[in-house]
Amino acid sequence: WIMGHMVNAIGQIDEFVNLGANSIETDVSFDDSANPQYTYHGVPCDCGRSCLKWENYNDFLKGLRSATTPGNSKYQSKLVLVVFDLKTGSLYDNQANEAGKKLAKNLLQHYWNNGNNGGRAYIVLSIPDLNHYPLIKGFTDTLTQEGHPELLDKVGYDFSGNDAIGDVANAYKKAGVTGHVWQSDGITNCLLRGLTRVREAVANRDSGKGYINKVYYWTVDKRASTRDALDAGVDGVMTNYPDVITDVMNEAAYKNKFRLATYEDNPWETFKK
């Protein structure tokens, strides 16, 4: 999965997919009442990027729905996975459950079209703080109460705080999550980060008894760091330059080992070599 980083304006969806992304990451900011409000990152952000592009969250969801609904004039068949980077740092811990409820209602109405031929992309809810694990239960309970538990088949989870792997496993246990887990690791492209924890996550994924199904690394913008990530065995790389990742995947060393994921590839299944 080539994951276009910080796709917060509707116009950027086409831009990143046309550069080779089959997945996008979108920032979600919340208001004081835990309502998802804007797709907005703000300053500071990755080097070489504008940090200030934004939409109202519900408007973005409608644009995303158009891009991921077969038959729509804006449909992009390659776009199969969306990571919502939930900026819950602005919330009190006791608002996490409420944020999950409100997120579920927004997605149900504006993305899934109340279960009636909505967008088809798989969704990852990426949470920066382990203490905010109740967001997951708020989300899953609400979709079930609203009569659409089947949509949870399209939803996965990530804790993005680079916490110790054991602590992340514990948070999932508390949240009642037993699958659909992506594990992120990384840092802004302005800084360097080694692959120690990525390798640990990959080992957990491949052990057959860990909690991780997929591993992604961010933010990967250079050919050398792309090769390092692929060599470490990641399932996804998040990037500001999808075309760079595509170029590396076409190199002799990688083109028979890796291919771009399609809609038929289940993002919750651990890949067995």
Swiss-Prot record:
Give the CC-aspect GO terms. extracellular region
Cofactors, names only = Mg(2+)
Q: List the disulfide bonds.
A: C45-C51, C47-C190
Q: Which residues form the active site?
A: H5, H41 (nucleophile)
Q: Quote the Pfam families the UniProt record gives.
A: GDPD_2
What is the superkingdom listed in this entry's lineage?
Answer: Eukaryota
Q: So what does this thing catalyse?
A: an N-(acyl)-sphingosylphosphocholine = an N-(acyl)-sphingosyl-1,3-cyclic phosphate + choline; an N-(acyl)-sphingosylphosphoethanolamine = an N-(acyl)-sphingosyl-1,3-cyclic phosphate + ethanolamine; a 1-acyl-sn-glycero-3-phosphocholine = a 1-acyl-sn-glycero-2,3-cyclic phosphate + choline; a 1-acyl-sn-glycero-3-phosphoethanolamine = a 1-acyl-sn-glycero-2,3-cyclic phosphate + ethanolamine
Give the EC number(s) under which this enzyme is classified: 4.6.1.-
Name of the top EC class for this enzyme: lyase
Tissue expression from the record: Expressed by the venom gland.
The answer to whether keyword Chloroplast applies is no
Q: Which UniProt keywords apply?
A: Cytolysis, Dermonecrotic toxin, Disulfide bond, Hemolysis, Lipid degradation, Lipid metabolism, Lyase, Magnesium, Metal-binding, Secreted, Toxin
Report TM segments. Answer: none
Purpose = Dermonecrotic toxins cleave the phosphodiester linkage between the phosphate and headgroup of certain phospholipids (sphingolipid and lysolipid substrates), forming an alcohol (often choline) and a cyclic phosphate. This toxin acts on sphingomyelin (SM). It may also act on ceramide phosphoethanolamine (CPE), lysophosphatidylcholine (LPC) and lysophosphatidylethanolamine (LPE), but not on lysophosphatidylserine (LPS), and lysophosphatidylglycerol (LPG). It acts by transphosphatidylation, releasing exclusively cyclic phosphate products as second products.
The family classification in the record reads: Belongs to the arthropod phospholipase D family. Class II subfamily.
Protein's recorded name: Dermonecrotic toxin LspaSicTox-alphaIA2ii
